[in-house]
Structures are given as structure tokens and as C-alpha cells.
Amino acid sequence: METFLFTSESVNEGHPDKLCDQISDAVLDACLEQDPDSKVACETCTKTNMVMVFGEITTKATVDYEKIVRDTCRSIGFISDDVGLDADKCKVLVNIEQQSPDIAQGVHGHFTKRPEDIGAGDQGHMFGYATDETPELMPLSHVLATKIGAKLTEVRKNGTCRWLRPNGKTQVTGEYYNDNGAMVPVRVHTVLISTQHDETVTNDEIARDLKEHVIKPIIPEKYLDDKTIFHLNPSGRFVIGGPHGDAGLTGRKIIIDTYGGWGAHGGGAFSGKDPTKVDRSGAYIVRQAAKSVVANGMARRALVQVSYAIGVPEPLSVFVDTYGTGLIPDKEILKIVKESFDFRPGMMTINLDLKRGGNGRFLKTAAYGHFGRDDPDFTWEVVKPLKWDKPQA
């Protein structure tokens, strides 16, 4: 059996770039909660002792941006300079303006357009992907890297590993074989964890705790063997972390947010963007389409692309590739997808209920992935029943 190696990485919520994603989406939640028609394009950047939120926001909501920044930093665990940032003492800069009236007129007709006539907020192309290798219909390498990162945060916050600090990165290399286009995981080849820690812990203790409390509960035994390689804090020391260690910026972890390098990516980030931004809503609808194709048994693996022009409601193109795993031709699957999903931005917003913010809805998406999550707020993960005729054996 000929196999190959494929690697996916993740970062947890204390990584500076992810901190910025979470602040941007916390701002989005706050705006949408009070005004579902808010137009939000909120960026965040951070470095030692400083967080800045900036961008274009048009909303009737009353939003305390500084409070959102401090609350988000605090909830992640940035409560002192020792861990990389002090939520209560850091400088918070705000530079937010209104959305350009040119964009507002072209896209929304200043709110005079019907939902089906609302144009895309920008040009671009987005991809959705699904694969039958996990129950989530997501790539195993990505799922494991993401869940290990989430587990790191869990054992830090519940006190299991008191030496942990907020910043951390994970990476999983899977060994696969190609079953006529479908991806079949054979084993986990390598697990890499680099996590921020305090001064009190030794490298041996770090390795022991990570294996026992983080890796063991997450990676199924069937994927581990005596040849699996573990790199646990291979650099030896990671005390300085968070914004003190590295600058952070919204939208720099787009592969971690999606499919871990599998499928494809159009390049647009998600966090801090309201649903008129097709970078986000378009990527959500094509994930639902790809997932529905696989979940309905039409293919074992699927990639769906959609593209847009600014101000134009109808997509310019829709594309489907099942990598040779389709039970019917891709052109027939494409026809079913186009008949079953409404790719117009205004309709995607309604069908996926994307104007509903608050309760940390979009904040949740900003760490540990936007896809493959079992959460009713992730409406794009709901499988749509598709009508198709299975070929006779």
C-alpha cells in the first residue's frame, strides 16, 4: 500500500493572531446583537502592552470597544505582563470610521434593496470542502491539530496543568493512502506541540503532562503506534508569549480557520466581517454545500467553489470537484448544488441566519475552526437533504 504524509497546524486562543480574530468577532457580535443590519469590517492588531481596533463600522448599536477588547483579553487568560499581556493595564487604541458610502450604495442600495437583490460586498472566490475521513466530514490532520489546541486551553483553564500559559501551537502529520480519490488515514506520523509555560516547570514535566492530559484524550489509539514521533516543546523554552512575544493581526490564520491545507482557499479572512462580506458568508455556504454532497452519499470527498463581483447578487461561477469519488458525474452534482443552495448574499444571510450576533456566536468561530463544529450556532454545518438518483449497481 502506497502512502503519503500530510500535515496540518493549529494555534490556540492565546496566539496573538487568534487574540486579534477573537476581538474582531467580539466586536461583530456586539454590533449585530443590537443592530442586525450592522456593517462591520473590524481589524485588530496587538503588540507588547497594546491592542488597536480599527476599520469601518456602520451601526445603530452603542458599542464600548475598549471594554470588549479588555474583556476578550481577560477571558483568554491575559491577566498579567508575565503571561504576555495585562488586559486591565494595556493601551487600547480605537480608530473606527463609517463604511464608505460608495460601497453602501453599490451593495445595499442604502437598505432599499430586497434581500435577493443585495449585491456581494466585494469580489472574490471562496471554497468549501468535505471528506468522509472523520464524523465531522473534515480532514483528520486538521481535526486532531485543532482539538489538541483546544485541549491545551481546557487543561490550562481547569487547573489540570497549572504551568500552562495562554499561547500555544500544535501540528499533526497524518499518514494517508489515496483510495481512488478518497483520503483514508492510516496512522498519526508526528505530533508537535509548542506551548507557553511558566518558569516553574521542567521539559520532562511538560512532555509527560502533554502526553497524558492533552494527546492521549484526543488522538484515538488506533492512530498511534511505537513509530509515532512526538516533538513536545522542541525549542526547549517558551516562557515569553502572547503579544509580548509576537505581534498579532486579524486574518492571518485562514488555513487554521478552514481545512488545514486540504481543499483550497480563496484568500479572504473571516473574523470581524458581517455577512454582506462574501469572504465569510460565501465560504460558509460552500462548506454547507460540500458537506451536504458528502453526507448525502453522492461522493466521499468534495470541493465547491463560488465567486462574486462587487454589487452583483448572482454568483459569477459555481464549481464542484469530487476528486473522482462521485457516484454520479460532477456536472450532475453541480446541477443539484445550484438548484439546492441560494448563493445570493442576501439569501445566504437569511438561510444561515447570519445576522444573529450576541452570546459570543461569532466569537466562538474565531478560535478552533469555523467548520466541523457541533454547535447549533454553526448553522452552515447543518446537512441539507439533496434529491438524487443513486445509480444501480
UniProtKB/Swiss-Prot annotation:
Q: What is its EC number?
A: 2.5.1.6
Where does it localize?
Answer: Cytoplasm
Q: Which UniProt keywords apply?
A: ATP-binding, Cobalt, Cytoplasm, Magnesium, Metal-binding, Nucleotide-binding, One-carbon metabolism, Potassium, Transferase
Q: How is the cofactor bound?
A: Binds 2 divalent ions per subunit. The metal ions interact primarily with the substrate. Can utilize magnesium, manganese or cobalt (in vitro). Binds 1 potassium ion per subunit. The potassium ion interacts primarily with the substrate.
Which amino acids does the record list as binding K(+)?
E43
UniProt function note: Catalyzes the formation of S-adenosylmethionine from methionine and ATP. The reaction comprises two steps that are both catalyzed by the same enzyme: formation of S-adenosylmethionine (AdoMet) and triphosphate, and subsequent hydrolysis of the triphosphate.
Q: What protein am I looking at?
A: S-adenosylmethionine synthase 3
Q: In which tissues is it expressed?
A: Mostly expressed in flowers, seedpods and roots, and, to a lower extent, in stems and leaves.
> Would I find Magnesium among this entry's keywords?
yes
- Ligand binding (ATP): H15, N167, G168, K169, S235, G236, R237, F238, D246, R252, K253, A269, K273, K277
* Binding positions for Mg(2+) per the UniProt entry: E9
Q: In which pathway does it act?
A: Amino-acid biosynthesis; S-adenosyl-L-methionine biosynthesis; S-adenosyl-L-methionine from L-methionine: step 1/1
Q: How does it assemble?
A: Homotetramer.
Q: Name one GO molecular function term.
A: ATP binding
GO CC terms of this entry: cytoplasm
Q: Which family does it belong to?
A: Belongs to the AdoMet synthase family.
Top-rank taxon = Eukaryota
**Named cofactor requirement(s):** Mn(2+); Mg(2+); Co(2+); K(+)
This chain's source organism reads Brassica juncea (Indian mustard)
Q: Where does L-methionine bind?
A: E56, Q99, D246, K277
A single GO BP term for this record reads: S-adenosylmethionine biosynthetic process
